[in-house]
């Protein structure tokens, strides 16, 4: 099974609120449809969910955030998810929408529900889930990052490969010279943060990918602007990107 995260930075224009990169989405899914094994797709919020999260000062830590903000973030994520689903169906991927409320209780994953996602993937459908604003309990809520969903699903289902599709080639040891780290285990990068991204941007992705690799999972970062690299990673060909492994 292959677990794939479509980063918010590649599926939306993060500098322009509520704008999807529809051509990029179509190109990526046109490559993903060629994968001949069960898949699970996760996508980020980009300029949809993150835009409203910042506006309403919502974060990944459960707290008493404005419930109007929760509602607006959820609605915006449904809008973005619909764009992904429409592109998937157009590309003959049998997309099966699974909001995170289907497998989360508070901020903890429900193991048997995640095991069911695997069965759905094996049936010929492709589960599609996403980062979202979730009710935590009483008057508390929080932002669940798509990167955290990757770790949750990865640790329970143990996919053959987990791929983060980004708008850059991978992790750079130096962001100015764009020197690519091909094997993360051998080198540690300097990470610059993007102020708009409440779920942690590249820092969060690296943390989650490292956690996944410590569980024995193989994780790749690839550039979605060159979507054939996704297939190269899946097929085991030499590809441009960053690998995380134990």
What are the roles of these predicted feature ranges?
Residues 2-246:
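C-terminal catalytic "cap/lid" subdomain
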């Amino acid at each position: 099974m292959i677990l794939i995260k479509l980063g918010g930075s590649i599926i939306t224009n993060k500098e322009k609120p509520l704008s999807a990169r529809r051509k990029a989405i179509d190109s990526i899914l046109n490559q993903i449809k060629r994968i001949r094994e069960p898949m699970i797709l996760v996508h980020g919020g980009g300029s949809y969910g993150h835009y409203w999260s910042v506006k309403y000062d919502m974060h990944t830590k459960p707290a008493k955030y404005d419930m109007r903000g929760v509602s607006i973030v959820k609605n915006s994520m449904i809008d973005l998810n619909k764009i992904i689903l429409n592109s998937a169906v157009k590309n003959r991927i049998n997309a099966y929408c699974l909001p995170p409320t289907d497998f989360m209780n508070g901020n903890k994953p429900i193991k048997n529900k995640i095991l069911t996602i695997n069965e759905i993937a094996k049936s010929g459908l492709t589960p599609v889930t996403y980062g979202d604003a979730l009710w935590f309990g009483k008057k508390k809520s929080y932002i669940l990052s798509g990167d955290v969903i990757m770790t949750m699903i990865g640790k329970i289902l143990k996919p053959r490969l987990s791929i983060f599709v980004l708008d850059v080639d991978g992790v750079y040891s130096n962001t100015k010279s764009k020197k690519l780290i091909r094997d993360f285990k051998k080198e540690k990068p300097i990470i610059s943060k993007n102020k708009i991204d409440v779920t942690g941007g590249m820092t969060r992705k690296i943390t989650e990918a490292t956690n996944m690799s410590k569980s024995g999972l193989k994780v790749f970062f690839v550039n979605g602007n060159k979507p054939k690299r996704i297939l190269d990673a899946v097929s085991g060909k030499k590809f441009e990107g960053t690998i995380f492994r134990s």
